Amino acid sequence: MHVQSQASSDDFFLQGVGSADPAVAEILAGELKRQQDQIELIASENIVSKAVLDAQGSVLTNKYAEGYPGKRYYGGCEVVDEVERLAIERAKQLFGCEHANVQPHSGSQANQAVFMVTMTPGDTFMGMNLDHGGHLTHGKSVNQSGKWFSPVAYGVRAQDHLIDYDEAYEVAKANNPKVIIAGGSAYSRHIDFKKFREIADEVGAILMCDVAHYAGLIVAGEYPNPFPHAHIVTTTTHKTLRGPRGGMILTNDKKLAKKIDSAVFPGLQGGPLMHVIAAKAVAFGEALKPEFKQYARQVIENARALAESLQSVGFKIVSNGTDSHLMLVDLTPKGVSGADAEIALERAGITTNKNSIPGDPLPPMQTSGLRVGTPAGTTRGFGPGEFRQVGKWIGEVLDAVASGEDPTPVEQKVRGEVLALTKRFPIYS
C-alpha cells in the first residue's frame, strides 16, 4: 500500500501559511496592519514592491549555490546562475562600475569582507565618529571592526556639523590608516568623495565608500557618485535603493575584485541566498526605470519639507537641513530625550528611532536626537504637504511630552489623524 509522505501531499505544496500555521499568520497580519496604519520615518527602512516580495518568497529559496555563476560547488545551478548574472549586470549598470558582488547577506557583512581584503588584525583604519553620523561597523569598540582593528575617527565641525575634511586629513597624516571609510548612517549632507580620495592618496590608503544610505539617490543622479574616486564601494540593497534586505560590494579594480569575491565566498559566507539575489535583481531593474529617478527627487524634496516643518515648530536640525533622505533632529530645545520621543511618537502612530547627535551628553540608549527619513513615506505617495503635516504632528506630540502633563490625549488625537492619512495612501491593499 502506498502511503503519501507529508512532503509529497497536496497540502504541503498548496497550503498557505494562513491554514498551515495560524499563529505565524496572525503575526504576519499584525505586522502588515502596523505598516499600513503607521507612518514610517525610520531612515533605513522602505517599502518594497509586490514584485520584490514575490521574488524573495519564490522557489529559489530551495536552492543551494555555493560559489559563483559558472563555478558552483553544486549541480542544478544553471537557472540561479542566470538570476545572479542579471543582478550583477544591473548593479554595474546602475553604478557605472566594472564589478559587482551581490552575494553579501547584509551591509555589515559586505564591510567585513572588505576589511578581510584590505587589512590584517591590528591594522589602522579611519572612519566617521559614530556620534557624528558614522556607523557601528566603521570602528565602534563593541563591533568586530573595533575589536579586530585599530580605528581612528574624523568628525563634523562644531559650528555647522559638516564633515571636517581638514581634521580628516590631519588624522590620516598622523595615523597612516590602511583604509579610509567615507560614508555614514546619520549624515544628511553631500559627501565629497573626491576630497576623501585625495586624502587617501596622500597617505597611501584604500578609499572605501559605504553608501548604504545614499545608494538609491546615487543611482538616480541625486547624490554624488563615489565612482570614479572610490577603490571599493559597499552598500545595502534596501533603504533608498528600495530592494530586499541585503548587501553588495562594487569596484573598478580587477585585482581587488578577485580578492573581494574570495573574501565573500568562501572567506565569510557559505551558500548565497538565491531568493534574495532574485529580489535584488528585481529591485535593480526597478531602479533603472525613469520612474525611480522621479522617486529619488521626491524623497529629497520631501525631506527638505519635513526639515523646514520641524524647524517651524521649534526643533533644531543638525547641519540646519538636508541634502538627502534623512535628517537628525536635535531635541534639546524641547528638553525631551530621543528614547522618550521615540516611544511617544510610536503611540501616536509615527515610527522613528532615537539617535545620538554630535557632542551628545546622553548615552546611546537615551540620546538627545531623533533620526527621521522620507523613503518609506514617499514610496506610499506622500508629498511635501503630507510631510509638512507630519512635522507639525511631531511638534504637537513632543510639546505634550515636554509639558510634563499626561500626553495621552494629544497622542490619541494625532493617532486618529495619522490613521486617516494612511488610509488615503494604502500599501499592499
From Swiss-Prot:
Catalytic activity, EC: 2.1.2.1
Catalytic activity: (6R)-5,10-methylene-5,6,7,8-tetrahydrofolate + glycine + H2O = (6S)-5,6,7,8-tetrahydrofolate + L-serine
GO molecular function: glycine hydroxymethyltransferase activity; pyridoxal phosphate binding
Subcellular location: Cytoplasm
InterPro entries, A to Z: PyrdxlP-dep_Trfase, PyrdxlP-dep_Trfase_major, PyrdxlP-dep_Trfase_small, Ser_HO-MeTrfase, Ser_HO-MeTrfase-like, Ser_HO-MeTrfase_PLP_BS, SHMT-like_dom
Entry binding sites for (6S)-5,6,7,8-tetrahydrofolate: L130, G134, H135, L136
Pathway info: One-carbon metabolism; tetrahydrofolate interconversion; Amino-acid biosynthesis; glycine biosynthesis; glycine from L-serine: step 1/1
Protein origin, superkingdom: Bacteria
Alphabetized UniProt keyword annotations: Amino-acid biosynthesis, Cytoplasm, One-carbon metabolism, Pyridoxal phosphate, Transferase
A single cellular component GO annotation: cytosol
Site residues, Plays an important role in substrate specificity: H238
Keyword Transferase in annotation: yes
First-tier enzyme category under EC: transferase
The UniProt record lists the keyword Phosphoprotein: no
Primary residence: cytoplasm
Record-listed N6-(pyridoxal phosphate)lysine modification sites: K239
Cystine crosslinks: none
GO biological process entries: glycine biosynthetic process from serine; tetrahydrofolate interconversion
Cofactor(s) the record lists: pyridoxal 5'-phosphate
Quaternary structure (record): Homodimer.
Free-text function comment from the UniProt entry: Catalyzes the reversible interconversion of serine and glycine with tetrahydrofolate (THF) serving as the one-carbon carrier. This reaction serves as the major source of one-carbon groups required for the biosynthesis of purines, thymidylate, methionine, and other important biomolecules. Also exhibits THF-independent aldolase activity toward beta-hydroxyamino acids, producing glycine and aldehydes, via a retro-aldol mechanism.
Similarity annotation: Belongs to the SHMT family.
UniProt-recorded name of the protein: Serine hydroxymethyltransferase
Provenance organism: Phenylobacterium zucineum (strain HLK1)
Lineage: Bacteria, Pseudomonadati, Pseudomonadota, Alphaproteobacteria, Caulobacterales
